[in-house]
Amino acid sequence: MKSTFGLLALAAAAKLVSAHATVHAVWINDVDQGAGNSADGYIRTPPNNSPITDVTSADMTCNVNGKNSVAKTLSVKAGDKVTFEWHHDSRSASDDIIASSHMGPVMVYMAPTEKGTAGNGWVKIAEEGYSNGKWAVANLIANKGKHSITVPDVPAGEYLLRPEIIALHEGNRQGGAQFYMECVQVKVTSAGTKTLPAGVSIPGAYKATDPGVLFDMYNSFTSYPIPGPAVWDGSSSGSSGSSDSSPATTAPEASVTSAPTKQGSADTSASPTTFVTATKPTTTAAPAAPPASTGSNSGSGSSGSGSASGSVKIYQQCGGKNYSGATSCEAGLTCKEWNPYYHQCLKA
């Protein structure tokens, strides 16, 4: 009998581990940089894919062993698209990314390497929460573990990019939310003029009782408050403040031309979700329990456009199939077509 219980416990533990995720690779402008999750790679990778659940732990910064640098640093420049590729086990096409029960937001932070390693200077540059009946993690799974950001116009130097998932399937109890994060080493080679704000400390940016951390995703709710600071708009130099109770706009599926991949990499036919965020429109009402991902991505995040009249602000949607909002961008912006379903206002 004891043996049976032991086997059941081991099976349950194995199932839990298999549901977790880490970042395995990065793409720059749709070019695969190869696996980066090793000591000779470019991702500060933890020894396993277990989550961090104590928001006061030093491991919140870059995960376990995250203070240790790795061999490589990726070169990027302002305006480059950086795509993070998450998996729970491997880059194989059959990998399920993360358990479908692990719904929650996806965010990206950036900090100068020295300050970031010490847990300071973290600036949120992208986030996606819950919108139009789907969680950010559902979109991530549909996109085969990929989501993207645009490198801001910051001064040249070495930085850390910190993609993060908060899984809320146990978020209805204090200490139940699961945090997954790694730090990617990058070197910005362009001479930008927009200095990052002072940022926040991690640990320190979250509390166990924050509404977006202690959150019951199984009860009826009308909005999800993404925790942490507000997203930096990429131009101001002020301090990152606290985020409000609505998820930020996130550009849906970006059009991607698959680049040659290194041997053993996963199928790259899915297009990553592109996060380019500036403002936070109000989220729509959510059902008591979020629907499961269908495996296709028809948009990740609110359009943020409001009504069909008026000028559309930077980084918000301005066109695309089935889109009925405003199509005229504010002065100095142009409506860029990412794919037939999503057009976005960007600097001309």
From Swiss-Prot:
Glycan attachment points: 322
Residues engaged in binding Cu(2+): 20, 102, 180
Q: Cofactor: bound how, per the entry note?
A: Binds 1 copper ion per subunit.
Q: How is it used?
A: Lignocellulose is the most abundant polymeric composite on Earth and is a recalcitrant but promising renewable substrate for industrial biotechnology applications. Together with cellobiose dehydrogenases (CDHs) an enzymatic system capable of oxidative cellulose cleavage is formed, which increases the efficiency of cellulases and put LPMOs at focus of biofuel research.
Q: Which residues form the CBM1 domain?
A: 310-346
The UniProt regions of compositional bias labelled Low complexity, in chain numbering, are 234-261, 271-306
Q: Which residues form the signal peptide?
A: 1-19
The UniProt entry, under Pfam families, shows:
AA9, CBM_1
Tell me the disulfide pairings in this chain: 62-183
Q: Which residues bind O2?
A: 169
> Where do the record's region annotations for Disordered lie?
233-306
Question: Which reactions is this enzyme annotated as catalysing?
Answer: [(1->4)-beta-D-glucosyl]n+m + reduced acceptor + O2 = 4-dehydro-beta-D-glucosyl-[(1->4)-beta-D-glucosyl]n-1 + [(1->4)-beta-D-glucosyl]m + acceptor + H2O
Keyword set, alphabetical order: Carbohydrate metabolism, Cellulose degradation, Copper, Disulfide bond, Glycoprotein, Metal-binding, Monooxygenase, Oxidoreductase, Polysaccharide degradation, Secreted, Signal
- Gene Ontology CC, one term: extracellular region
Q: Which GO terms describe its biological process?
A: cellulose catabolic process
> Which InterPro entries does the annotation name?
AA9 (IPR049892), AA9_LPMO (IPR005103), CBD_sf (IPR035971), Cellulose-bd_dom_fun (IPR000254)
Q: Name one GO molecular function term.
A: cellulose binding
Q: What is known of its domains?
A: Has a modular structure: an endo-beta-1,4-glucanase catalytic module at the N-terminus, a linker rich in serines and threonines, and a C-terminal carbohydrate-binding module (CBM). The CBM domain is essential for binding to and subsequent oxidative degradation of polysaccharide substrate.
Q: Which family does it belong to?
A: Belongs to the polysaccharide monooxygenase AA9 family.
Its function, per the record, reads: Lytic polysaccharide monooxygenase (LPMO) that depolymerizes crystalline and amorphous polysaccharides via the oxidation of scissile alpha- or beta-(1-4)-glycosidic bonds, yielding C4 oxidation products. Catalysis by LPMOs requires the reduction of the active-site copper from Cu(II) to Cu(I) by a reducing agent and H(2)O(2) or O(2) as a cosubstrate.
Q: What is this protein called?
A: AA9 family lytic polysaccharide monooxygenase A
